[in-house]
Amino acid sequence: MDFVDFDSFSNDEITGEDNLPHPQPALSLPITSNIETIGKRISSLNTITRSLLKFEGTDEEEGESSSENASKENELAQKYAQMSLNFLKKEETQHGSDGKIANGVDGKSYNDFEHSKATLSTRLSRVLNDSLSETLLREIFSHLEDKYSSYDDSIDELIEPGVVGSMSRKKLRGKVENELIKNQSLVLKEYQPVIKQLKVVEDRLSKLNDLNKVTNDNIENKFKYSSEFNTKVKELNSEKRLINLKKNLLINFKAKFTLNEYEEFVLDSGDINDEFFTVLKKAEEINANCSILLSIENPQLGLKIMSKSNHLINRSVERIINFTNKTLSNLYSLNSKARLRTLHQCMRYLKNKLNYFSNVVNTFVDSRAKVLVDDFLSQIQGNLDSNGNVSTFKRRSSSISSETSSRPIYVSAHDPIRFIGDLLAYVHSLVVNESDTIISIFTFETSESEVEKKEFETIIKDIIDKILKSLVKPVKSKVTQIISAETKLSTSYSIFNLVELYSMMFTKQLSDTSEVSIALKSLVKASQDRLASIISNRLASIRTSNSAQLELNLDLQPPEWIIEFYSDLLPILDQTTTDTIFNFTAEENEEFMKLLVDEPIEIFFEHIGSNKIFESKKDQLILKHNFLDLILSKLLPITIVSDKVIEINEMINTLTQELTQLQLEAILKECGLYDYYNIVNMICPFSDDFFDTSIYEPIKENQLYNKSELLKINEIIQSYIPNALLDIQSSLLKLNPPSIVNEVTTNASLEFVKYYGKLSQINSAFLQETFTWSDFEIATLLGVDEDYTEFIKLVANSG
């Protein structure tokens, strides 16, 4: 706490009548932060003082730690009290008689006063603005209050402004300071052992400091002598590092941008092996790294190095190309694994240079293609001997590994099947041998990656296709010539089978997109077209042939040409195992079916129509029926033409219905009922589902419909019907299928009985007259009694 005295007895500066002390003027304290709580703090001053005094009393009982805090507080209080007394003295001096400051007091005293005032303001503001909590301030003042009460002094004397108050405060201050000194002494006693130990340590540290000083002096002296040496060593190390750097730069430059004499010799004249490609790779890297040298100010060095490296690289590439071409032109040299491995390295290198690689491949393809074509032509273009027979000759083997001659191809115009078989077998052997050769040459034992492996598989396929493409034109030309010249259906079919077989073999060996496979497929198509053409030409000649028309006679049997036609064709169809004939497409198969079935039927019907001997429609129907029945019997065992069998059955059913109708009309005419049949049908045709005699009442208006006419008809029926069945069967004797004869006879007779029975009901209704025989009796005489009985039951059940 700061002690502030309100009186001053400094008479040196103040003279006048008023010797009493005056209150200290107001101070401008910067206590804005505590202005709101200052009143509250002053009002609780007594409480704080009492708490402070109590707190001090408690501290005395607690021991040496509390006395130390009290000593510090007393010292601080004494300090601020002295400052307050100084300010009071200056205030008295300022307010002396006659106003010494106003009447010429020197400016120095006034300035000292202002300075003291500012100092006191600062000190007081520090105390009042100290960031102490209210609780702590309360305890401090309470302790102070308790301490004051212990001396039995009046509190009023302590706050008086006069001499008594000043003396009381000084007395209190002395007591507080005395107590503070005691407390501090107790604290200092605690540190006395430590101080003794520190003095011992001080002696030792002094010795160490002396030793350190001596050592430092020695080091400094030595450093002065060695500094020059160190400087020189440093310079030498720097120079050494620079030299090493230059040396490393030169070594690296030489390693990256130059080839030694041996490496140049390897590229220019050395053997092509692993070392050659290693040096070549280094030369290419040097050439690529020269771009760095070209970017400097003087690019001449880079240009010279690039020129030299380019020369070596070009020379090396030429050597690689020459080696590759020479090796591929003499494939016997590939028996050496080392040479084959070197060839693979060359091709792997050239693959990255497409223009060079393409030239090498094209050269190889041209040479192999020429060899294959020469071999093929040597087989085909043989010389005839003096007797005109085809001579045979040995062919040069197209197989690289074969040293023996193969079996020659016999070119014979009388055996085209054997010739084409031998020819295609020879071509297939060429394809297999050439494919194996190319694969063995261009397949690497150890590929660097799957991508490279796939790339060379594509290259192998392309090379094989290009080489074998040379055979396409001569093979296709020769086989097409033989196919076009052949006129026998069986021979053409055998050729077709051969070509189709080898087409599948070539497709399996090569691929669908290879030129050879495409050529064989075109030959298959040509043989298919030739088969269809042979059949079409044969039918065209039959269409215009007079002999074919003359084969038709009154015996109503099918002509011989249709038997001969199917006798050649059906064995071929019977051998077919594919879904379509000759493996045609669906559209082509449909067209061929029309050529096979529809066109012969059309030609036959034209011949019937143009032949005048068949004036009877019944004979025409029987002849057509017999013709279709013959075709049906030929085609029925062959499952591949089942659709056409169904169509022919439908045509036969149509003809059977027409023939049945003609036979019914013949029976009606023989019985004299044909006109009545027409009259009834004009009114309303008979129906098995519904019949009512009232519908036919208009028949009475017809002049022919009377009893006398019916009596005549009854007599005719009685005379004809007993022999009618024999007459019907005799008229159908030339109809070949017995089942059709029975069907026509039964259906015609049954229809007649139905008509007869219904007409009898009409007669009974409108003429009250009926025929002598009933419909069941007529059915019995015609042999259809069972069929008619079933019909009556069926009508009765449906009604």
Curated annotation (Swiss-Prot):
SMART domains from the UniProt entry: COG6
Localization of this protein: Golgi apparatus membrane
Superkingdom in the source lineage: Eukaryota
GO biological process: intra-Golgi vesicle-mediated transport; protein transport
Gene: COG6
Mode of membrane association: Peripheral membrane protein
Keyword Endoplasmic reticulum tagged: no
Biological source species: Scheffersomyces stipitis (strain ATCC 58785 / CBS 6054 / NBRC 10063 / NRRL Y-11545)
Residues in the signal sequence: none
Listed GO CC annotations: Golgi membrane; Golgi transport complex
Sorted UniProt keywords: Golgi apparatus, Membrane, Protein transport, Transport
Any Pfam family the entry gives: COG6_N
Similarity section: Belongs to the COG6 family.
InterPro entries attached to this UniProt entry: COG6 (IPR010490), COG6_C (IPR048369), COG6_N (IPR048368)
Record's protein name: Conserved oligomeric Golgi complex subunit 6
Function: Acts as a component of the peripheral membrane COG complex that is involved in intra-Golgi protein trafficking. COG is located at the cis-Golgi, and regulates tethering of retrograde intra-Golgi vesicles and possibly a number of other membrane trafficking events.
